Amino acid sequence: QMCIRDSNVSLPIKASGAYSPKLQKAVILGRENGRERSLAIIYHELSHHFVSQILGKRPPSWLNEGLSEYFEHCTIHKKAVRHTFTEYEQGRVRTMYMLGEVNLPTFLNSSQGKFMKQQMTDEQYSYILSHALVTFWIESVPREIFKKFISVLQNKNDPSTVSEQINLVYPGGFQQFEKDFEAAYK
């Protein structure tokens, strides 16, 4: 771990940046080569800021990292923004399903500690699955349903789990969500 004194932000040695919701500060280390990769890190960390502004200080880990990964994988062109979910990531999600490694309710409802532990011990599992989930929500689910889901997440008085919240807003409920998500990556 490395600590940047002026910002009081700690980050893993290999990290290119970090965001502190408490301080509302992003730290970008400038370790990346080239403008495009540097912008990707900036988009990633800036996304954390926007998520914390919209959902508060404790958004679901998968959504926070998934949105950050989504925007990190976007490039801006003259007339459009293009997102890329890489072949490696697609293959990794397919493999997770083939090996029976995906338990969506457990993953979606997990604490940040469990999320990060799985990320560190299992070949980018958490970030890749989060990126896949957010890509599915943004690119496959009707916008109104995604908006409704975000609105439900904003209610801090709602004690229900994320999977229960999805069950409320997704047509056909959580089981249909699981089927549709898995089908998108087979």
Model-derived segments and spans:
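Acidic/His/Gly-enriched intrinsically disordered linker/tail segments
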Residues: S10-K22, A26, L55-K186
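Short pre-active-site segment immediately N-terminal to the catalytic Zn-binding motif
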Residues: L23-I42, Q53-P59
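Solvent-exposed coil/turn segments that connect beta secondary-structure elements
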Residues: R31-N33, L46, H73-C74
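Active-site recognition of the HExxH zinc-binding catalytic motif
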Residues: A40-Q53, E65-E69
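Short, small-residue-biased leader/transition segments that mark boundaries at the very start
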Residues: M2-I4
